Curated annotation (Swiss-Prot):
<keyword id="KW-0479">Metal-binding</keyword>
<feature type="domain" description="MTTase N-terminal">
    <location>
        <begin position="3"/>
        <end position="120"/>
    </location>
</feature>
<feature type="binding site">
    <location>
        <position position="164"/>
    </location>
    <ligand>
        <name>[4Fe-4S] cluster 2</name>
    </ligand>
</feature>
<comment type="subunit">
    <text>Monomer.</text>
</comment>
<feature type="binding site">
    <location>
        <position position="161"/>
    </location>
    <ligand>
        <name>[4Fe-4S] cluster 2</name>
    </ligand>
</feature>
<feature type="domain" description="TRAM">
    <location>
        <begin position="378"/>
        <end position="441"/>
    </location>
</feature>
<dbReference type="InterPro" id="IPR007197">
    <property type="entry name" value="rSAM"/>
</dbReference>
<keyword id="KW-0004">4Fe-4S</keyword>
<keyword id="KW-0408">Iron</keyword>
<dbReference type="InterPro" id="IPR020612">
    <property type="entry name" value="Methylthiotransferase_CS"/>
</dbReference>
<feature type="binding site">
    <location>
        <position position="157"/>
    </location>
    <ligand>
        <name>[4Fe-4S] cluster 2</name>
    </ligand>
</feature>
<keyword id="KW-0819">tRNA processing</keyword>
<dbReference type="Pfam" id="PF01938">
    <property type="entry name" value="TRAM"/>
</dbReference>
<feature type="binding site">
    <location>
        <position position="49"/>
    </location>
    <ligand>
        <name>[4Fe-4S] cluster 1</name>
    </ligand>
</feature>
<keyword id="KW-0411">Iron-sulfur</keyword>
<dbReference type="GO" id="GO:0051539">
    <property type="term" value="F:4 iron, 4 sulfur cluster binding"/>
</dbReference>
<comment type="function">
    <text>Catalyzes the methylthiolation of N6-(dimethylallyl)adenosine (i(6)A), leading to the formation of 2-methylthio-N6-(dimethylallyl)adenosine (ms(2)i(6)A) at position 37 in tRNAs that read codons beginning with uridine.</text>
</comment>
């Protein structure tokens, strides 16, 4: 009988990426196969997130449900990973005795060893250290699961915003070597991946070592990735305004593989609140970045994060946020009511904004951004959009679903052979969360591919010709 593994994941795309690597790791080295049913599993792993309110309580509620499974099967191994594990450490075991393994985001690569320790009789195996970027050196080769893939390029954050736990749970910023990232993406491209999403808590702070002892900036990395044959779209998540430098903006001007969509969190439009949040920039500086971006890429769509009801936020502060939303014309947002995270500087501030007021402000903000998004979607009516077909439509399996460059889902009638490739569709209808398309042409009528193997890019470097034009040559 095959050994079964069940992973429950909460939180950001980085956690989703980490969970996929856990599955690959335990599958390759220990022969575990994934199951959706916790009752079938020999190992249960909970990959946690500490961003939301009452994150710890949510973890213990889940562990309570899993305890009943362990009572029936004493050989069942239960592990807790992610940011709550990093934050709480041994306290998780003290409260939930059913837990065997506690590991942090930076130590998931040690899971096979931890499992063996438990099998040998150790009562609790805990490792929530920050061993630089070691975890990427011990993970198996990437495995594509469709035409899109996430690739982690760095870990941690060194900005220490007053409300955020990330520096304490994932550590300081550490970048992967650029050659390792390029190799991983080249391997994914050879498996049919067409779009990559570069992941990090603050990707534009990326400064990765090169094979010759130099440093690769984020802008340079974007150009290297764009040169890999088969990679026709590049996204990245998440970035910080204070390091969104001109060289990154320049990439938007000359690199069509970089999509016309950017998630750039601002959190608030009030300079007073931005200062209290320790964001390191003012609203006018954020707008300057957007202005320069739209000069380089006029059709780019912008999304953001917003925290509503941060300590001390007045009606005037909220009005400043709404003014920024109107000025920038945000297309989408992840907006949340503020709740204090234990151990952060903001947790010591009085939470003095009434909850009903917070809820009202959140509803107003979300309504405004929904209106702006619908306005732009209507402008897309009648246009031809190139979409990457990801699979069957969620609502109608007889149809196909894809995503536009500006991150809108499009459902259309098409043949299964188009899954994993690009098609052009005419937008014929607009809904709140999706668009309706009419098939125009398939990829065989486009000129997208180059006669290069993805591995060829590993030997390339940037070189300027006599006219100052940048090229990538062997």
């Amino acid at each position: 009988m095959s050994k079964k593994l069940h992973i429950k994941t909460w939180g950001c795309q980085m956690n989703e990426y980490d969970s996929s690597k856990m599955a690959d790791l335990l599958g390759e080295y220990q022969g575990y196969t994934l199951t959706e049913e916790a009752e079938e599993a020999d190992i249960l792993l909970l990959n946690t997130c500490s961003i939301r309110e009452k994150a710890q309580e949510k973890v213990f509620h889940q562990l309570g449900r899993w305890k009943t499974l362990k009572d029936k099967n004493p050989d069942l191994i239960i592990g807790v990973g992610g940011c709550v594990a990093s934050q709480e450490g041994k306290a998780i075991k003290d409260r939930a005795h059913c837990v065997d393994i506690i590991f942090g985001p930076q130590t998931l690569h040690r899971l096979p060893d931890m499992i063996e320790q438990v099998r040998r009789g150790e009562k609790a195996v805990i490792d929530v250290s920050f061993p630089e970027i070691e975890k990427f050196d011990r993970l198996p080769e990437p495995r594509a699961e469709g035409p899109t893939a996430f690739v982690s390029i760095m870990e941690g954050c060194s900005k220490y915003c007053s409300f955020c736990v990330v520096p304490y749970t994932r550590g300081e910023e550490v970048s992967r070597p650029s050659d390792d990232i390029i190799l991983e993406i080249a391997q994914l491209a050879e498996q049919g991946v067409r779009e990559v999403n570069l992941l990090g808590q603050n990707v534009n702070a990326y400064r990765g070592a090169t094979h010759d002892g130099g440093i690769c900036t984020f802008a340079e990395l974007l150009r290297y990735v764009a040169a890999i044959d088969g990679i026709d779209r590049i996204r990245f998540t998440t970035s910080h305004p204070i390091e969104f430098t001109q060289d990154i903006i320049d990439v938007y001007e000359d690199t069509p593989e970089l999509v016309s969509f950017l998630h750039l969190p601002v959190q608030s439009g009030s300079d007073r609140i931005l200062t209290a949040m320790k964001r390191g920039h003012m609203a006018i500086e954020y707008k300057s970045i957007i202005r320069r971006l739209r000069k380089a890429r006029p059709d780019i769509q912008i999304s953001s994060d917003f925290i509503i009801g941060f300590p001390g936020e007045t009606k005037e502060d909220f009005a400043d946020t709404m003014k920024l939303i109107e000025d920038v014309a945000f297309d989408h947002s992840f907006s949340f009511i503020y709740s204090a995270r234990p151990g952060t500087p903001a947790a010591d501030l009085p939470d003095d904004v009434d909850m009903e007021e917070k809820k009202q402000r959140l509803a107003i903000l979300q309504d405004r951004i929904t209106q702006q998004a619908m306005r732009y979607s209507r402008h897309m009516m009648g246009t031809v959009q190139r979409i990457l077909v990801e699979g069957p439509s969620v609502k109608n399996p007889m149809e196909l679903r894809g995503r536009t460059e500006n991150n809108r889902v499009v459902n259309f009638e098409g043949q299964p052979k188009h899954i994993g490739s690009f098609v052009d569709v005419e937008i014929v209808d607009v809904y709140t969360n999706s668009l309706r398309g009419k098939f125009i042409r398939g990829e065989d009528e486009m000129d997208l591919r180059r006669n290069l193997r993805p591995s060829d890019i590993l030997a390339k470097h940037k070189q300027d010709d006599d006219l100052g034009v940048t090229q990538f040559k062997p």
